[in-house]
Design a protein with these regions (language model features):
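Amphipathic alpha-helical
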Residues: 1-9
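Flexible, low-complexity interdomain linkers flanking nucleic-acid-processing modules
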Residues: 121, 138-170
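Short, flexible loop/turn motifs enriched in small residues
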Residues: 24-31, 78
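Two-metal-ion RNase H-like nuclease active-site motif
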Residues: 12-26
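A short, polar/acidic, helix/strand-boundary loop motif
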Residues: 36-64, 72, 90-103
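Beta-sheet entry/capping signal
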Residues: 16-18, 30, 41, 80-83, ...
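Short conserved beta-strand segments at catalytic cores or DNA/RNA-binding microdomains
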Residues: 22, 32-41, 86
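RNase H catalytic domain
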Residues: 70-142
């Protein structure tokens, strides 16, 4: 990974995998991606942000969504050339230039770089408008099966009514 980014090649190697990545702070407040490694079918995934993550900037969340893709799919992406479609131009710049002025985002980028290097993935990002990004759907998807009570509310119920005999969505 590093040797490919130290000097710029005149021609890039052909893309062998494509991913659309997105993060959202509205609706489902989560992240999502669509990954295709031909000849396989497209693989979608999504999740919701933690409370701590929701305190972060949308730029950070977009970068974190890329890391979530790599954490889940890096073994399948080993030795591939990955084209990342990103609807955030700042994050696209950060991924392509491997630098950020934000220490927090630079730390997140380092974690991404570790995964890319470990699995020998060559990645580059391109911009796509949000309206055209299929991952936008997954980042806003509300998973109705993934509900839970706030921990403080669950404790209040247990304190008031005693030990539970049924599941409290946890």
């Amino acid at each position: 990974f590093t040797e490919h980014n130290v000097s710029r090649a005149i021609w890039r190697p052909p893309v062998t995998a494509t991913a659309y990545v997105d993060a959202s702070r509205v609706y489902g407040a989560g992240w999502g991606y669509e990954l295709t490694i031909p000849p396989a079918q497209m693989v979608p995934a999504h999740g919701i942000w933690t409370r701590q993550e929701l305190l972060k900037s949308i730029n950070f969340l977009e970068l974190r969504a890329v890391r979530k893709l790599l954490q889940r799919e890096a073994p399948a992406l080993a030795n591939h050339v990955l084209l990342l479609w990103e609807d955030n131009q700042s994050v696209m710049y950060i991924l392509n230039n491997l630098v950020s002025r934000s220490q927090e985002m630079q730390a997140e980028l380092r974690l991404i770089m570790v995964l890319l290097e470990k699995y020998d993935i060559l990645a580059h990002a391109r911009y796509i408008r949000s309206e055209e990004n299929p991952a936008d759907y997954w980042s806003r998807l509300v998973d109705k099966a993934d509900w839970q009570l706030r921990p403080d509310l669950a404790q209040r119920l247990i304190h008031r009514w005693g030990p539970r005999t049924i599941e409290l969505f946890d």
